[in-house]
Amino acid sequence: MLIINDNNLSGLSLQRVNGTGELSVQFKDGRSRISRLYQEGAAKIRMPQAVTGPLEAILINTSGGLTGGDRLKWDVALDDGASAVITTQACERIYRSGGGEARIATRLKAAKGTRLAWLPQETILFNRSILSRRLDVELEEGAQMLVVEATVFGRLAMGERVVAARFADRWRVRLGGRVIHAEEFRLGPDVGAELQAPAVAGGACAMATVLMVCEQAGRHLETARAIIGEEGGCSLWRVGKASKLVVRLYAPDSYALRRRLCPLVALLNGKAGLPKVWTI
């Protein structure tokens, strides 16, 4: 008989999650099509059948979540004239860390005349989780982009409360080789107390950042503000020939956040609208 206790396990190293997914999209024969697809480890990419409109890709982490020491990488590139909507099968879950941080690194590249929408579902952080998330975007002049990243600290409906965690979120967005948007957001280790601060979240446990870059982003400003309401804000800048629309949303829980985030994404994503997996 084998008896397992803490002494038996102390010298063992846990299996780590490693996943890499790479997707390149081209415009050929009147449609946006796959030109390259690479999948490794826990990262999988699936494409629902679409006859018209942008290519839709659904990212899947087959491990079901991440914890300390896990690594997940996504790389998406659009060639001239292509369009794509990238989303995830489900919310990404970041579980309690037994040591080290979970890392999610995303790189997006969009050539001239492309339209790229990066629309993952929420990332949920559990108590004592540690996450480092990085987003790097390279846009050529004339490319259009919509990016959404939503983060939830615990699921209130499940009675979950995040008291301690660490979260680092780094964004770098370049247009024509020039940085037009940069973020360095950090929370922790006392996340529960920090979220209560009026200058941070005012007690909210769910938040989202939305970034749109295109020549006509300004036409959505007033409608976006009406959707956002008082729990958030929306600003507009000129960046060369393009405009940059930045939205911040916060809410007491993920359900309240989605009630405004979903119509906002549907507005900003044009004819492509809201990804179907968001409503399942």
Curated annotation (Swiss-Prot):
The UniProt keyword set, sorted, is: Chaperone, Cytoplasm, Nickel insertion, Virulence
> Looking at the record's lineage, which domain of life comes first?
Bacteria
Q: What is its main location?
A: cytoplasm
Its Gene Ontology molecular function terms?
A: nickel cation binding
Family annotation (Pfam families):
UreD
UniProt KW Chaperone keyword: yes
Could you tell me where this protein is found in the cell?
Cytoplasm
**InterPro entries xrefs:** UreD
Q: Which GO terms describe its cellular component?
A: cytoplasm
* Keyword flag S-adenosyl-L-methionine: no
Its subunit composition reads:
UreD, UreF and UreG form a complex that acts as a GTP-hydrolysis-dependent molecular chaperone, activating the urease apoprotein by helping to assemble the nickel containing metallocenter of UreC. The UreE protein probably delivers the nickel.
Q: Which family does it belong to?
A: Belongs to the UreD family.
* Role: Required for maturation of urease via the functional incorporation of the urease nickel metallocenter. Disrupting the ure1 operon causes loss of urease activity, decreased resistance to low pH killing in vitro and decreased pathogen survival when inoculated in BALB/c mice by gavage.
- Name this protein carries in UniProt: Urease accessory protein UreD 1
Q: What is the organism field in this record?
A: Brucella suis biovar 1 (strain 1330)
